[in-house]
A protein has these predicted regions:
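GIY-YIG nuclease catalytic motif and its immediate N-terminal context
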Residues: 1-44, 48-75, 79-80, 85, ...
């Protein structure tokens, strides 16, 4: 086995702020790549219509299932609670791109 095969995939739940001030929530294995996709017109239909987007929140989770569950939890929050979540959890240097 190669050294690379021992590297565990990281999963993240993320939130971006769209140009219309709305939040879009999703999950990914690479938040910076995913934001670039959203801004390059290769993301979700919503972000293509309301871009550009800015990464405002990233949370690492255990696995794919956890990412989906956390995404659903965040999507149920209202706008003010999403804004508070982003404000209370500043991006680490790794994701300031």
């Amino acid at each position: 086995m190669t050294e690379e095969s021992h590297v565990k995939t990281r999963f993240y739940c993320y939130m971006v702020r769209c140009a219309n001030d709305a939040f879009y929530t999703g999950w990914t294995t690479d938040p910076l790549r995913r934001v670039a996709e959203h801004n390059g017109g290769r993301g979700a239909r919503y972000t293509r219509m309301h871009g550009p987007v800015k990464l405002v929140y990233v949370e690492q989770v255990e696995d794919h299932v956890s990412a989906l569950k956390r995404e659903a939890q965040i999507k149920r929050l209202g706008h003010a609670r999403k804004a508070a979540l982003a404000e209370a959890n500043p991006l680490s240097e790794e994701f300031k791109g």
